[in-house]
């Protein structure tokens, strides 16, 4: 199909497709279960007036902005490392909550725990019981003489070799990345096309929201800003349309 035919080809924009962000240090966020992707290019114009005329003699663009917002159906740690300046480590600590009585000798019977850190010990009346309950680094429990009868709730952390930890650093900026998106669509006659969207340099806006709610699945979003392409390039964003074989 000739270029002039594609330029004037009307396409139905539906479906979501998939995308990937790759930072300058090779951090990757792949998005294959998104709910929506929106790219918004805006411009600020300035008018120049002269003489007695009421219409501007000239108008020019003083500023351009490009933004992409992606709403995902699933939460991924890779999204956190793109949205924030992060340090990723493995073998982090996992939170636990267990219920114990004065007869308990271990936080979890039969479990091998290491690196235990007590968060809170709550007595049967809902008060702090940390003075009456001792917890060891390997999960052993000892109740003092002053401990009352009843059920105790113990919150603690323990090392888990399978955990992955994303530390959000207070003075770190989100990394510059490239943005690629692709989806398949069709024209009114049913012919298939692929649309690719590319931005050479982008950076997340630093916003991160994690929300949980009973009986509801929430959709985390990622907002990124398109930057000047730099390095002598003029194309800050590119849209490519390709006809697909039947």
Model segments located where?
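Solvent-exposed edge beta-strands and adjacent loop segments
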Residues: 2-82, 132, 195, 199-221
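Extended beta-strand solenoid/passenger and fiber regions
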Residues: 76-134, 158-193
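Short N-terminal helix-initiation segments at or just after the protein's N-terminus
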Residues: 2-18, 159-172, 246
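Mixed-charge, glycine-accented linear interaction segment located at domain edges/termini
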Residues: 121-125, 135-137, 143-147, 194-246
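Short secondary-structure capping micro-motifs at structural edges
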Residues: 54-58, 139, 162-169
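Beta-strand elements of well-folded, non-transmembrane domains
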Residues: 41, 72-76, 158-160, 183-189, ...
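Small/polar beta-strand repeat architecture
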Residues: 145-164
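Beta-strand secondary-structure signal
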Residues: 67-71, 153-155, 178-180, 221-225
């Amino acid at each position: 199909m000739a270029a002039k035919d594609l330029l004037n080809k009307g396409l139905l924009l539906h479906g979501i497709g998939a995308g990937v962000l790759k930072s300058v240090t090779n951090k990757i966020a792949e998005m294959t279960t998104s709910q929506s992707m929106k790219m918004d290019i805006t411009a600020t114009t300035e008018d120049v007036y002269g003489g007695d005329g009421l219409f501007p003699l000239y108008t020019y663009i003083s500023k351009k902005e490009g933004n992409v917002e992606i709403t995902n159906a699933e939460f991924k740690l890779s999204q956190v490392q793109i949205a924030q300046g992060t340090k990723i480590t493995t073998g982090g600590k996992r939170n636990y909550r267990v219920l114990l009585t004065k007869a308990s000798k271990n936080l979890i019977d039969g479990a091998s725990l290491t690196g235990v850190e007590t968060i809170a010990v709550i007595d049967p009346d809902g008060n702090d019981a940390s003075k009456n309950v001792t917890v060891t680094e390997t999960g052993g429990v000892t109740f003092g003489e002053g401990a009352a009868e009843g059920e105790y709730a113990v919150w603690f952390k323990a090392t888990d070799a399978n955990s992955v930890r994303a530390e959000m650093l207070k003075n770190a900026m989100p990394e510059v990345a490239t943005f690629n998106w692709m989806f398949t669509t069709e024209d009114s006659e049913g012919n298939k096309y692929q649309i690719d969207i590319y931005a050479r340099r982008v950076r997340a806006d630093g916003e991160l929201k994690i929300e949980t709610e009973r009986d509801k699945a929430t959709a985390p979003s990622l907002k990124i800003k398109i930057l000047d392409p730099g390095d002598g390039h003029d194309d800050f964003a590119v849209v490519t349309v390709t006809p697909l074989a039947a």
